[in-house]
């Protein structure tokens, strides 16, 4: 289990979500500056220090891409999976009838609209956010597609809200467990998913 923590202070454009934008509910673009990133190898005992590890850095995984592009990073919300607006079932292969086509999964629109409407309660088009992820080194934060993995927190009506948790608790995302997650993080997502399932079953008149 990772002991360090990476913290990213940035801004989130509410308009990136459907219907105005194309972001899925579990993938968020965050606006950043050169001083947005800070890291502590032991948050309980050592202060966070600004890190420049991502400036002009290239991430190599399924493809090569810049970690920061046009002052933006892509966050894959840790521990959750939401249905997609533009899902591609397979890699392009010669002879496939639906080669290259993208499909909209059930509730893909609803999940991202609900997230949009919730974030819009801030009354602003662009709102401050904080991304947190537990890693031993800053460069451990990426997935194979070059996205940052972490939790996003925003402030709505004076209250800090973890968007990963909010999506699961309200039934708009499923639990998806990562090797990088601690037992505490896994248990939190699991409890929220059980709460959501119990509430939805009750809403549909099921025991």
Where are the regions that the model predicts?
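Small beta-barrel nucleic-acid-binding modules, primarily SNase/OB-fold domains
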Residues: 1-207
